[in-house]
A protein has these predicted regions:
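Gly/Pro-rich cap/lid or specificity-loop segments adjacent to the active site
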Residues: 1-21, 25-179
C-alpha cells in the first residue's frame, strides 16, 4: 500500500497560486474485480488515512472498506486544508465565546457569523487563498488523482460532507463514475 501526499495548486484559477499538500492512502488489489473505490471523508476535518488496514473496525474506519480490501483498489483522501499528511489550516488564535445556556438561535447565528468573519479576515493577511477551499476544488483534487493513477472509472463512497463532494464530482465528471 501507499500512504503519501499529492500536491495541487491551492487555487487552480490563479496561475500564481501556491502549492498545497493533500494526504492519501491507496491499497492496490492484486486481482481487482471492479473499479477502484474512492473514500471521501466527512468534515471538515475528517480523515481515513490513519484508520487504514488492518485496523478498520477498531479505528472507526469507513464502512465497506474492510469488505472491499483485496477485491478492488481502495483510495482514501484527506480534505484539502485538513490533512495531517499534507497542508493543515490551523487557526487557534480565535476562540469563540461560550454561548450562555439560554442563548437564542439568533444569538448563536450572530456569534457564528462574527467568528467566521474574523477568521476570514485573519486569513486574508496570510499566504492562504481561501478561494481555493471549495467543493469544486475538492472535486478537481479527486479527478487529478484518478488520472494520475490511470483509473478510467471510479466508485465514490462519501460520508457526510464526503457525500456532497461525491455529488459534485458526479455532476462534473459523470463519465468517470462507475457508481
Amino acid at each position: 500500500h501507499q500512504i503519501g501526499t499529492f500536491y495541487v495548486k491551492e487555487n487552480r484559477s490563479d496561475p500564481k497560486s501556491r502549492v498545497i499538500g493533500i494526504g492519501f492512502a491507496r491499497y492496490i488489489a492484486r486481482k481487482p474485480k471492479g473499479p477502484p473505490v474512492f473514500f471521501l471523508p466527512g468534515g471538515p476535518g475528517g480523515s481515513y488515512i490513519d484508520s487504514v488496514p488492518p485496523q478498520f473496525k477498531q479505528s472507526g474506519g469507513p464502512l465497506l472498506a474492510e469488505e472491499l480490501l483485496g477485491r478492488c483498489d481502495l483510495v482514501f483522501f484527506d480534505l484539502r486544508g485538513y490533512s495531517e499528511h499534507g497542508s493543515f489550516l490551523k487557526d487557534r488564535a480565535f476562540k469563540p465565546k461560550s454561548a450562555p445556556p439560554n442563548a437564542t438561535l439568533q444569538y448563536r447565528v450572530r456569534e457564528f457569523k462574527r467568528f467566521a468573519q474574523e477568521v476570514v479576515e485573519r486569513y486574508r493577511r496570510t499566504v492562504v487563498d481561501l478561494r481555493g477551499y471549495s467543493v469544486l476544488e475538492c472535486v478537481e483534487d479527486v479527478n487529478e488523482v484518478r488520472k494520475k493513477f490511470g483509473y478510467q472509472k471510479i466508485v465514490l463512497r462519501g460520508q457526510s460532507f464526503g457525500s456532497q463532494w461525491s455529488f459534485g464530482y458526479l455532476k462534473k465528471y459523470p463519465e468517470a463514475v462507475e457508481r
